[in-house]
Structure formats: structure tokens, C-alpha cells
Amino acid sequence: MERQKSMEKGLLRKSLSIRERKFPNEDAFLESGLSRKSPREVKKPQNDDGECRVTASVFLSTFVAVSGSFCTGCGVGFSSGAQAGITKDLSLSVAEYSMFGSILTLGGLIGAVFSGKVADVLGRKRTMLFCEFFCITGWLCVALAQNAMWLDCGRLLLGIGVGIFSYVIPVYIAEIAPKHVRGSFVFANQLMQNCGISLFFIIGNFIPWRLLTVVGLVPCVFHVFCLFFIPESPRWLAKLGRDKECRSSLQRLRGSDVDISREANTIRDTIDMTENGGETKMSELFQRRYAYPLIIGVGLMFLQQLCGSSGVTYYASSLFNKGGFPSAIGTSVIATIMVPKAMLATVLVDKMGRRTLLMASCSAMGLSALLLSVSYGFQSFGILPELTPIFTCIGVLGHIVSFAMGMGGLPWIIMAEIFPMNVKVSAGTLVTVTNWLFGWIITYTFNFMLEWNASGMFLIFSMVSASSIVFIYFLVPETKGRSLEEIQALLNNSVQ
């Protein structure tokens, strides 16, 4: 234990001091063991402050990874746009459609249970391919469904793929991106989900639901093809002891003219330190040294879902209809605004920081939920009926857009940043399961609560959003501008 503490403190001092050091060319030659060569023969020394350039390979790899997020968004947006058509064609009751809508999150829960282990065994790339098998099969089942059973089976399979995606995509991006753009690149996960949701919100108003499933298949096939052209995560390769492949992958990501030896050595040192005791089992996760990051990860996912985000997104059409606002117009307006707002958040996440965006997002979600509570409360008592459609539109729009700007993507960024490699499987699985478990509870009960007491439901969501602000302010650290190794060293140091 003393040896491990010493190594952690040493790594912390090394990580923090590197920020202030600038290695001149002479020192770069000495540290890398290179002899003097002509400028054309020498690779550029990479300062280990993470400020390396963002190469085309990093852009391409991130884009391909978040194409899976786009597939996720298509699956999430499908239930809102297809609700009227499916209910009419297959004569589904409210309970049957609630099961169909929510079973995606149940599948996500099943996928989340195995997500960490699958990603650890197969690797990040092959895990994404594995996900697409479930997604493609699921879309085909929904497209050919003649009754509720086939609908539910297809939606469940799609959910399993989406559940594994939700873990492996942010982890993969966090492991390949330089630290000064890591937040923005991981947030692209949420951006592309919003693009998928927006697309289905818009076209779901105009095309039959079976044709909509075919549209959902197209990005899945595209994603499978593109995955063959990106490198594997260097940190996963290093964890398996495949150092040569790790350096090759890192070289491809950082550029062929960059000396990656210092970054590769830092990755190796950190993995050696964190895995000194071997792979951590789920039963061993609940130790004092892991308590702080575990509370952060699980807490954020718990609060994310109890703010009502999944229910509002899945059943936006029902909310508009209940408030007397045209659902086709409402969902189209949401779709138009969601993507630009998420793009803005993608830019701001590495400028404003995680904490600021999270608290701003929760504040806006809380106010939007409060407005919806007032709107449906007025409606139930017959007060100012002419304002109900306006309040409903503003409330639903504000809730979904503010979620997209922060609380939607940032918990996944933080999850990918705070856990060391030796607990990333068990901790990441637990955090992802928490998200999907409470997501399923919210989406399944949402329609029933909406019919029972819509005003009271949104009042609860508003109070949870307020509680989230307190949680973030006191417990969630700022991880902007730090490498994964620095974050892990600082979190370890904070509990000693």
C-alpha cells in the first residue's frame, strides 16, 4: 500500500510539473535517446501537456465512433415520431405502447451489464461492431413486426446495442483524444445523438413508421463499414501488454512526425501503477479509494434520469398533445434547435468547464419542468386555458434543449475520465447500469404518471434538478484541461 501511495504521488508530481516544462530540442534528444540527425530525420518532440495537434486520424476516429451515437439517437427519436402510426396500425393500448417505448431502456440496461466486460475483452472497435449486430437485427424486427411481441423484441435488441454503445463510445474517444479537446470530442457523442433524435422528430411527421425503420438501418450499415478504418484505443492495447501495437496506434493518432515516446511511457507507467493488484472485481469496487469517483459517476447518472429527461424526449408528442399544442410543429421546432445548441455546448465544454455547464443545464431543466408543472396545473383547474399550449411548448422545448446542452452528455464525459484502467470495467458497468435502470423506470412509468398527475410529476422533476445543482457544486470536480493520468492521480490523492 505504501509503495502504491508513493507511486501515485510521484505520478501526480510528474503530471503537474510537466505542464510547466518546455523541453528544448537538445533535451528532447537526450530524453528520447536519439542521436543528432538532420531535421528531416528527427520526429517532433511531443510536450507531455496534451497540447499536441489534433490530427485527421483523431477527427476521423471520433467521427466514426460517434456515428454509433447517431444510431442511438435514431432509436430514441423513433418512439415519438412513430407513436401515432404504430398505435393505429397495430391497435396498441397505452400500456402496450409504453412497454414498446420503454423496452429500449430495458435493453439498454441489459447491454450495460455486459458493456464494460465486452469492451475489455473484444476491444473498443470490435465492441462497436458487436453493438451494430444487435441494432441492425432490432431495426429489421421492428420493420417486419405484425404485433406487439415483434415490436418489443426488435426494440429490446436495439436497446442492447445502444446500451453497450453508451459505455464504449465515450470511453474510446476519451482514450484517443488529446486532453485539451477531449471534452469537446466526447461531447460529440451527445451532439450526434441529438442529430439522430432531431432527424426522426422531423421526418417522423411525414413518412410511415415502417419506412422510418429503414432510415434507421442506413447509419448502422455505414458505421459497420467505417469501423474498419480507425485504430484501436492505445490505452486498451497497453493494458493487454501489447506495447508495440499501442505505440503504433498512438503514432497513427498523433501523426507520423511526432515523437510519442513520452506519452506512451506515461500511459504504461499509469497502467502499471493502477493494475498493481490485478483487475478489480465488482465486489472489490466498494473500497474507500474508489468511493469518491464512484459517488460522482453513479450520482450523476441517477440524477440525469430522475430529472425526467428520457420521458420528455421519448414522449414529446404526447406532452404537446396533452397541452393542446400541435405535436408536428413542436417536435420540428425541437429538432431545429437541439443540434445548434448541442454544437454550442461542444465548443463550450472545454472553455467553460464541466461544472459550469452542468449547473447551467440543471438550472434550465428545473425551470422548464416547473413551467410544465404550472401549465398542466392551470389546465386541470381551467385557469388561463389560452396560455397552456404556449407554456407547454416553452417547457418541453426548454427541457430537451437544456438537457442536450449539458446534462445529456457531460455525465458520460466525466464517467470516461474519472476511473482508472483497473476499475474502468466494473465501475463503468455499474455507472452505465444505473443510467439505464432509472431510464427504464422513468420511460415505463412516464405515460401513467402523465395521466395520473402531470403537474405533480413535473414538480418532482423540478425539485430533482435543483438537488442536482447542489450535488454538482459540492462533489463534482473540474476535469477540464487535465490528462486522464492527471485526473486519476488527483482523485487518488484526494482520498488519501
Curated annotation (Swiss-Prot):
SUPFAM superfamilies in the record:
MFS general substrate transporter
How would you describe this protein's topology in the membrane? Multi-pass membrane protein
In the record, what terms sit under GO molecular function?
A: sugar transmembrane transporter activity
| GO cellular component annotations of the record | endoplasmic reticulum; membrane
GO terms under biological process: response to abscisic acid; response to cold; response to salt stress; response to water deprivation
What's in the keyword line of the UniProt record? Membrane, Phosphoprotein, Stress response, Sugar transport, Transmembrane, Transmembrane helix, Transport
Tell me, in one coarse class, where this protein mainly resides: membrane
Q: Where in the cell is it found?
A: Membrane
Where Phosphoserine occurs, residue numbers? S256
| Bilayer-spanning residue ranges | 58-78, 94-114, 128-148, 156-176, 183-203, 211-231, 292-312, 329-349, 364-384, 394-414, 430-450, 456-476
Induction and repression of expression = By dehydration and cold treatment. By drought and high salinity conditions, with maximal expression after 1 and 2 hours of exposure to these conditions. Expression in leaves decreases after exposure to the high salinity and abscisic acid (ABA) treatment, but expression in roots remain at a constant level.
Q: Which Pfam families match?
A: Sugar_tr
Please name the Gene3D superfamilies in this protein's record: MFS general substrate transporter like domains
The entry's note on the tissues where this protein occurs is:
Expressed in both shoots and roots. In roots, expressed in epidermal cells and especially strongly in cortex cells. In flowers, expressed in sepals.
Cross-referenced NCBIfam families: SP (TIGR00879)
**In which family does this protein belong, per the annotation?**
Belongs to the major facilitator superfamily. Sugar transporter (TC 2.A.1.1) family.
Task: Describe the function of this protein.
Answer: Sugar transporter.
Name the chain's protein.
Sugar transporter ERD6
The species this protein belongs to is Arabidopsis thaliana (Mouse-ear cress)
Q: Which gene encodes it?
A: ERD6
